[in-house]
C-alpha cells in the first residue's frame, strides 16, 4: 500500500468519524450510526454479497469496474463499522503488516496456538 493510499483511507475514516454525532437527516453515515451496529453489519452483509455477484459477473465477461465499485462500497461500510467500534484503518493496516511474510498456513497455526494458550491448554 502506498502512503497516499493509506492517507486516503485515513482521510475517509476521519470524515466518517466526524459524522458520528451528526444529523441522521443530513448524512447517510450519521443515519447508519444512529441506527446502530446491526444496521451497519446488515449493510456489510449486503455489500459482501454484491461483491460476490459482481465477481461472478466479471468471470462471465462483465465489467471489472462494477466489481471495483462494489468492493469500494464494501470497504466504505467496513470503515463505518470500524469507526463505530472506535477502530481505524491504521489498526487493520497494522494487522496486515504483522501478517506479511507469514504463509496463511503458518498464520492459522499461530492463531490456534495462541487460542490454546489463552484457554489454558
Curated annotation (Swiss-Prot):
Gene Ontology CC terms: cytoplasm
Which pathway is this protein engaged in?
A: Amino-acid biosynthesis; L-histidine biosynthesis; L-histidine from 5-phospho-alpha-D-ribose 1-diphosphate: step 2/9
Q: Where in the cell is it found?
A: Cytoplasm
Q: What EC designation does it have?
A: 3.6.1.31
In which family does this protein belong, per the annotation?
Belongs to the PRA-PH family.
Under PANTHER family, the record lists: HISTIDINE BIOSYNTHESIS BIFUNCTIONAL PROTEIN, HISTIDINE BIOSYNTHESIS BIFUNCTIONAL PROTEIN HISIE
Q: Would you tell me the protein name for this molecule?
A: Phosphoribosyl-ATP pyrophosphatase
| Origin species | Burkholderia multivorans (strain ATCC 17616 / 249)
Amino acid at each position: 500500500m502506498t502512503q497516499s493510499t493509506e492517507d486516503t483511507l485515513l482521510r475517509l475514516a476521519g470524515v466518517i468519524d466526524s459524522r458520528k454525532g451528526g444529523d441522521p437527516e443530513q448524512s447517510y453515515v450519521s443515519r447508519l450510526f444512529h441506527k446502530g451496529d446491526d444496521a451497519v453489519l446488515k449493510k456489510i452483509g449486503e455489500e459482501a454479497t454484491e461483491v460476490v455477484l459482481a465477481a461472478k459477473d466479471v468471470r462471465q465477461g462483465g465489467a471489472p469496474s462494477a466489481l471495483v465499485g462494489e468492493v469500494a462500497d464494501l470497504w466504505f461500510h467496513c470503515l463505518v463499522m470500524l469507526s463505530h467500534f472506535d477502530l481505524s484503518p491504521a489498526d487493520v493496516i497494522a494487522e496486515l503488516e504483522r501478517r506479511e511474510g507469514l504463509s496463511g498456513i503458518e498464520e492459522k497455526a499461530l492463531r490456534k496456538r495462541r487460542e490454546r494458550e489463552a484457554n489454558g491448554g
